[in-house]
């Protein structure tokens, strides 16, 4: 049941969904993140866990998350199958998609509040400076609250409901995920706003290894070439290269009282 597959198996869904959803694609390892246990107190988000391998024995989310499902071929592929099966993308105001090697260093409600305040349709937290395989655009820029951009990385994207409904069809265009963020960025046009939130940080706890890493070994085993998938999407959007860039800067403010 807990394995990569073309289909998914739903194990639990909420009867009364909260405003937002945090969806984690997870395997058998211990997670380093905020979600090693269920957050205490009031929260405006549900937790969803999508397993591609048997959960770790200490994984509390297996029995305590509001949403549990198994299967899917990768993070966005599984998410598409889940939303097609449940229709919950029509209910949640926004969804944050995470891998299980992402450690978030903030309360998700604070992130959702910033996305709401600045009307971000597509967004991500900034990465800590010690993430050595991160693009410069996605690393924290000290002194900034956020930057609007024309691109958000597939690693941990947030989608507001309207943009999620618009882009859901694309989630299985690339099983590796390569190129999906270019597709989303291309379709922002003048209608949607994307941003990287510098005030709230996340850490990528594992360095991606395209040769020996478990995910890339899995992709080779099913005949998926990430470079070819990205090339296909660049052809699809008739843009090569795609230039990712910041657009507008929102600076942090500081108050002094006497």
Question: Which residue stretches match the model-derived regions?
Answer:
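Active-site-proximal specificity loops/subdomain of glycosyltransferases
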Residues: 35, 49-93
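Short, hinge-like loop/turn segments at secondary-structure boundaries
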Residues: 65-67, 140-143, 212-215
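A structural signal for short, well-ordered beta-strand segments and their strand-loop junctions
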Residues: 97, 122-126, 193-198
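A short acidic, amphipathic alpha-helical/loop segment
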Residues: 33-38, 81-82, 109-114
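Short beta-strand-to-loop acidic/aromatic patch adjacent to the donor-nucleotide binding site
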Residues: 90-103
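Conserved catalytic core of nucleotide-sugar-dependent glycosyltransferases
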Residues: 104-181, 185-189
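N-proximal low-complexity "stem/linker" segments adjacent to membrane-targeting elements
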Residues: 1-60
